A protein has these predicted regions:
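Terminal alpha-helical segments
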Residues: 1-141
Length: 141
């Protein structure tokens, strides 16, 4: 994780793009759920949250090159100090874990009802919360 590698103009553009991508990807997740595509739904839910969280980090001039870097910096910069409710961190970690399971585990079939659907609302709340924080941050500067 590094701090401040982007120019202010580039940072604002990247934040806007990632927030748009987060909301578009969330819609893809909902469509996948409606069509019964469990693994795709989990993948899209995770990536929607990932894009939103990474936008938040970038809005504060943090940049990560890995998924684990984003997860760790989110915890360090926003969860541990109570800026954001720790439940959002739990949601983000659950999404990451399920995404890995859906993408790479051959012996575990994800269940839409018990594993995916319970995360839809918390994922949306996470995305909306961090999106608003990122927007406020880039427009205040």
């Amino acid at each position: 994780m590094t701090k401040g590698q982007l120019s202010d103009t580039d940072r604002i553009e990247v934040v806007k793009y990632r927030l748009e991508k987060a909301h578009r990807t969330y819609k893809e997740a909902v469509g996948s759920i409606e069509n019964g595509y469990v693994e795709t739904a989990v993948n899209r839910l995770y990536y929607a949250a990932y894009y939103a969280v990474s936008a938040l980090l970038i809005s504060y001039k943090y940049e990560a090159s890995t998924h684990n870097g984003v997860i760790q910096m989110f915890g360090k910069a926003f969860l541990r100090n109570g800026v954001i409710d720790k439940e959002y961190g739990k949601t983000f970690n659950q999404l990451f874990s399920l995404r890995l399971t859906g993408d790479y585990e051959d012996r575990h079939i994800l269940d839409m009802t018990t594993e995916v659907l319970p995360l839809v609302k918390p994922a949306k709340e996470l995305i909306d919360t961090v999106s608003e924080m990122a927007k406020e941050r880039i427009y205040l500067e």
